[in-house]
Amino acid sequence: MQIIADLHTHTNVTDHAFSTLTEMVQAAHDMGLKAIAITNHGPTNPDGPHEWHFSNLNLVPRKMNGVTVIRGIEFDITAPSGGINVMANKSLKHIDWALASFHECLFPPADRSIHTAALESILYNPYVNAFGHLGNPNFDFDHEYIISRCNERGKVVEINNASL
């Protein structure tokens, strides 16, 4: 299997990441990747940048050092109803790729049925393309049901080695 893109990365505008956009693109190039999505946390996450970061993504070149740069975000799942970070439409228009993920700081782990319901609701969110790090053991859910529904709704499930 050849990996051609990394669709879940954070630059140093997210507190737990340490590389600049330029460094991330260079690393992607050095690894032979064709594309990289820059998906910093949403603005309501304590680890995320200000919303202006996402408004300014239109300034990021589409191609750097031969690597396609995908302008993205990692939305936080914030409610059992499938709520995610709220952003102004002017910021969302610069987003090409969006993940939705559970993070303990904004969604305390609950039970399997609550996690499943939240994920199912997000299947209908037109701004979300994929689910991030579903392998987090703190957020058990009905895998078979959600994965089959992702296929029906055209959503992607990330394989994240940090969760393995």
Please state what every model-predicted region is.
Residues 1:
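Catalytic phosphate/metal-binding cores of nucleic-acid and nucleotide-processing enzymes, i.e., regions
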Residues 163-164:
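Short, intrinsically disordered, charge-balanced linker/junction segments flanking boundaries
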Residues 29, 42, 47-159:
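Extended substrate/RNA-proximal surfaces in nucleic-acid metabolism proteins
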Residues 4-14, 38-42, 131-135:
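Histidine-centered catalytic micro-motifs
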